[in-house]
Amino acid sequence: MWPPCGTLRTLALARSRGARACSGDGGVSYTQGQSPEPRTREYFYYVDHQGQLFLDDSKMKNFITCFKDPQFLVTFFSRLRPNRSGRYEAAFPFLSPCGRERNFLRCEDRPVVFTHLLTADHGPPRLSYCGGGEALAVPFEPARLLPLAANGRLYHPAPERAGGVGLVRSALAFELSACFEYGPGAPALPSHVRWQGRRLALTMDLAPLLLAARSP
C-alpha cells in the first residue's frame, strides 16, 4: 500500500471545489476523491513545464501550492504509466495507480520534466526529474538531447512507461545550451554538443517519438 495515500486523500478533498470542468480537455467534469465504484477513489493532477505537480483543479498553481513531499513524488512518478483505464483517457493521458486509487495526470507538455543534473565523483551523470532527486533519475545522454525549434524547448529520453521523452526545465536547458555547437551559416538548431571533452553529434532520434506523442 502507498503510505502517503491517506494524507493525499485528505488534502485533495480539502482543496476540492466540487465537480469542475477542466479547461482545454473537452469539457470533462470530475470531483476530486470521487468514487465511481465501491472502495475506489479517483484524483486528478497536473504537471507544469517546470515539473511541479498540482491538484488539477487548483486555481492557483505556483511553488506554494505544488506538491513537495519527496516520498509522495517518487511514488507518484515511479508508478506513472499511460492511461488505459477506459476513463478520462483523452483528457488525462497518464495514470499513477495506488491500490484502489486512480491518480489521473495531464501535463502542460510532458509528464516527465527534468529539473537537475546530478554529478558524482564516481559514476556517470544523471538527470533527475519532477522533484524526486536521485530516486527519480535517468542516465544523462547528451548526444540524444533534442532541441525543438517549434517551441524553443529541449527534450531528453525518459522512462518508456512515461512516454519515452521528457522535457528539460528551462533553467537547466539554458545551462546545457552552452555546450551546443552550430553548423556554418548559424542554423536554427545545433548539430553537436560538447560534453566532458568530447564532441558528440546530436542524434535527433527522439523527434519521431515526440511528434507521435503530440499527434491527436
Curated annotation (Swiss-Prot):
Family matches, as PANTHER family: UPF0598 PROTEIN C8ORF82
Family membership: Belongs to the UPF0598 family.
Pfam families: DUF4505
GO cellular component terms, A-Z: mitochondrion
Protein's name in the database: UPF0598 protein C8orf82
Protein origin, superkingdom: Eukaryota
Coiled coil: none
InterPro entries: DUF4505 (IPR028108)
